[in-house]
Design a protein with these regions (language model features):
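Flexible, gly/pro- and Lys/Arg-enriched active-site loops
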Residues: 3-5, 10-173, 179
Length: 179
Protein backbone atom coordinates (compact mmCIF):
# COMPACT_ATOMS: atom_id res chain seq x y z
CA UNK A 1 0.00 0.00 0.00
CA UNK A 2 1.33 3.44 -0.94
CA UNK A 3 1.60 6.08 1.79
CA UNK A 4 -1.21 8.60 1.83
CA UNK A 5 -0.29 12.07 0.60
CA UNK A 6 -2.57 14.64 2.23
CA UNK A 7 -2.78 18.09 0.62
CA UNK A 8 -4.82 21.25 0.91
CA UNK A 9 -6.13 22.85 -2.26
CA UNK A 10 -7.49 26.41 -1.98
CA UNK A 11 -7.87 29.71 -3.80
CA UNK A 12 -7.02 32.57 -1.44
CA UNK A 13 -7.31 36.32 -1.96
CA UNK A 14 -4.47 38.59 -0.82
CA UNK A 15 -6.42 39.40 2.37
CA UNK A 16 -7.08 35.71 3.14
CA UNK A 17 -10.66 35.57 1.83
CA UNK A 18 -11.76 32.21 0.43
CA UNK A 19 -15.51 32.79 0.28
CA UNK A 20 -18.44 35.13 0.55
CA UNK A 21 -21.99 33.97 1.27
CA UNK A 22 -20.93 30.36 0.56
CA UNK A 23 -19.62 31.18 -2.94
CA UNK A 24 -16.29 32.18 -4.45
CA UNK A 25 -16.05 35.97 -4.78
CA UNK A 26 -14.25 35.64 -8.12
CA UNK A 27 -14.60 33.63 -11.31
CA UNK A 28 -11.37 32.19 -12.68
CA UNK A 29 -11.97 29.48 -15.29
CA UNK A 30 -8.24 28.65 -15.44
CA UNK A 31 -8.22 28.02 -11.69
CA UNK A 32 -11.15 25.64 -12.07
CA UNK A 33 -9.24 23.76 -14.80
CA UNK A 34 -6.19 23.64 -12.52
CA UNK A 35 -8.35 22.26 -9.69
CA UNK A 36 -9.78 19.59 -11.99
CA UNK A 37 -6.36 18.56 -13.31
CA UNK A 38 -4.98 18.14 -9.78
CA UNK A 39 -7.92 16.26 -8.30
CA UNK A 40 -9.17 14.07 -11.16
CA UNK A 41 -8.96 10.41 -10.22
CA UNK A 42 -8.25 11.16 -6.56
CA UNK A 43 -10.20 11.66 -3.36
CA UNK A 44 -11.51 15.08 -2.38
CA UNK A 45 -12.59 15.77 1.18
CA UNK A 46 -14.91 18.70 1.85
CA UNK A 47 -17.23 20.06 4.47
CA UNK A 48 -20.99 20.06 4.06
CA UNK A 49 -21.15 23.78 3.25
CA UNK A 50 -18.52 23.40 0.54
CA UNK A 51 -20.54 20.54 -0.93
CA UNK A 52 -23.67 22.72 -0.82
CA UNK A 53 -21.85 25.55 -2.60
CA UNK A 54 -20.77 23.17 -5.38
CA UNK A 55 -24.26 21.68 -5.52
CA UNK A 56 -23.26 18.19 -6.67
CA UNK A 57 -20.52 15.61 -6.47
CA UNK A 58 -17.57 16.29 -8.73
CA UNK A 59 -17.26 13.56 -11.37
CA UNK A 60 -14.14 11.45 -11.75
CA UNK A 61 -13.23 11.78 -8.08
CA UNK A 62 -14.20 10.09 -4.85
CA UNK A 63 -16.19 12.76 -3.00
CA UNK A 64 -16.10 12.60 0.80
CA UNK A 65 -18.26 15.00 2.80
CA UNK A 66 -17.56 15.66 6.46
CA UNK A 67 -20.57 16.83 8.47
CA UNK A 68 -21.79 16.71 12.05
CA UNK A 69 -25.37 16.33 10.79
CA UNK A 70 -26.13 12.67 11.41
CA UNK A 71 -29.08 12.60 9.00
CA UNK A 72 -27.22 14.23 6.08
CA UNK A 73 -27.17 12.28 2.80
CA UNK A 74 -25.57 13.12 -0.53
CA UNK A 75 -26.14 10.95 -3.60
CA UNK A 76 -22.94 9.42 -5.00
CA UNK A 77 -20.80 10.75 -2.14
CA UNK A 78 -19.38 9.19 1.00
CA UNK A 79 -20.67 10.98 4.10
CA UNK A 80 -18.69 10.79 7.34
CA UNK A 81 -19.07 12.61 10.63
CA UNK A 82 -15.46 13.27 11.62
CA UNK A 83 -12.28 14.19 9.83
CA UNK A 84 -10.65 11.12 11.35
CA UNK A 85 -13.30 8.92 9.72
CA UNK A 86 -12.64 10.58 6.35
CA UNK A 87 -8.89 10.07 6.56
CA UNK A 88 -9.19 6.49 7.81
CA UNK A 89 -11.76 5.50 5.20
CA UNK A 90 -9.98 7.01 2.23
CA UNK A 91 -6.44 6.40 3.38
CA UNK A 92 -6.82 2.78 2.37
CA UNK A 93 -8.07 3.56 -1.14
CA UNK A 94 -6.03 6.44 -2.52
CA UNK A 95 -2.48 7.71 -2.33
CA UNK A 96 -3.54 11.37 -2.83
CA UNK A 97 -6.19 13.04 -0.68
CA UNK A 98 -7.16 16.67 -1.24
CA UNK A 99 -8.82 18.84 1.39
CA UNK A 100 -10.87 21.30 -0.70
CA UNK A 101 -12.67 23.30 1.99
CA UNK A 102 -14.13 24.89 3.82
CA UNK A 103 -12.44 27.02 6.40
CA UNK A 104 -13.06 24.64 9.31
CA UNK A 105 -11.51 21.66 7.49
CA UNK A 106 -8.56 23.83 6.44
CA UNK A 107 -8.03 24.80 10.09
CA UNK A 108 -8.28 21.17 11.23
CA UNK A 109 -5.85 19.85 8.62
CA UNK A 110 -3.26 22.59 8.17
CA UNK A 111 -1.05 20.92 10.78
CA UNK A 112 -1.49 17.49 9.14
CA UNK A 113 -0.87 18.09 5.45
CA UNK A 114 2.42 17.67 3.60
CA UNK A 115 1.58 19.98 0.69
CA UNK A 116 -0.41 23.15 -0.03
CA UNK A 117 -1.70 23.91 -3.51
CA UNK A 118 -2.73 27.55 -3.31
CA UNK A 119 -4.07 29.85 -5.95
CA UNK A 120 -2.89 33.18 -4.57
CA UNK A 121 -5.14 35.89 -5.92
CA UNK A 122 -3.25 39.17 -6.02
CA UNK A 123 -6.17 41.31 -4.91
CA UNK A 124 -8.27 41.85 -1.79
CA UNK A 125 -11.90 40.73 -1.83
CA UNK A 126 -14.82 41.24 0.53
CA UNK A 127 -15.70 37.99 2.20
CA UNK A 128 -16.88 36.21 5.31
CA UNK A 129 -14.76 33.06 5.13
CA UNK A 130 -10.97 33.06 5.47
CA UNK A 131 -8.05 30.69 4.98
CA UNK A 132 -6.22 30.09 8.25
CA UNK A 133 -3.04 32.06 8.84
CA UNK A 134 -0.01 29.80 8.63
CA UNK A 135 3.70 30.19 9.32
CA UNK A 136 5.33 30.30 5.89
CA UNK A 137 8.71 29.57 7.47
CA UNK A 138 7.46 25.98 8.02
CA UNK A 139 7.05 25.57 4.25
CA UNK A 140 9.22 25.55 1.14
CA UNK A 141 7.80 27.13 -2.00
CA UNK A 142 8.49 24.56 -4.71
CA UNK A 143 6.75 26.22 -7.63
CA UNK A 144 4.97 29.41 -8.65
CA UNK A 145 3.20 30.13 -11.95
CA UNK A 146 1.96 33.65 -12.64
CA UNK A 147 -1.30 34.10 -14.56
CA UNK A 148 -3.57 36.97 -15.54
CA UNK A 149 -7.25 36.35 -16.19
CA UNK A 150 -8.59 36.89 -19.70
CA UNK A 151 -11.94 38.19 -18.54
CA UNK A 152 -13.29 40.94 -16.38
CA UNK A 153 -12.99 39.08 -13.08
CA UNK A 154 -11.18 41.59 -10.88
CA UNK A 155 -12.30 44.72 -9.08
CA UNK A 156 -13.76 47.41 -11.33
CA UNK A 157 -13.86 44.98 -14.27
CA UNK A 158 -10.10 44.69 -14.55
CA UNK A 159 -8.16 41.50 -15.34
CA UNK A 160 -7.06 39.64 -12.24
CA UNK A 161 -3.52 38.45 -11.50
CA UNK A 162 -3.17 35.15 -9.66
CA UNK A 163 -0.42 32.61 -8.99
CA UNK A 164 -0.55 28.81 -8.75
CA UNK A 165 1.79 28.11 -5.84
CA UNK A 166 2.89 24.79 -4.34
CA UNK A 167 4.34 24.62 -0.83
CA UNK A 168 5.85 21.51 0.74
CA UNK A 169 6.21 21.19 4.49
CA UNK A 170 9.85 21.44 5.54
CA UNK A 171 11.27 18.07 6.57
CA UNK A 172 12.22 19.46 9.99
CA UNK A 173 8.57 20.31 10.70
CA UNK A 174 6.66 17.14 11.48
CA UNK A 175 2.96 16.98 10.63
CA UNK A 176 0.75 16.59 13.69
CA UNK A 177 -0.98 13.33 14.52
CA UNK A 178 -4.75 13.10 14.59
CA UNK A 179 -4.81 11.50 18.04
Amino acid sequence: MKPVHLSILAAVARNGVIGRHNTLPWHLPEDLKHFKALTMGHTIIMGRKTYASIGRVLPGRTNVIVTRQLDFHAPDAIVVHTLEDALHLQGRQDDALFIIGGARLYEQTLGLVQRLYLTEIQQDFDGDTFFPVFDRSDWIEVSRERHVSDGQTGMAGMPLEYHFVVFDRKQTVEPKNLS
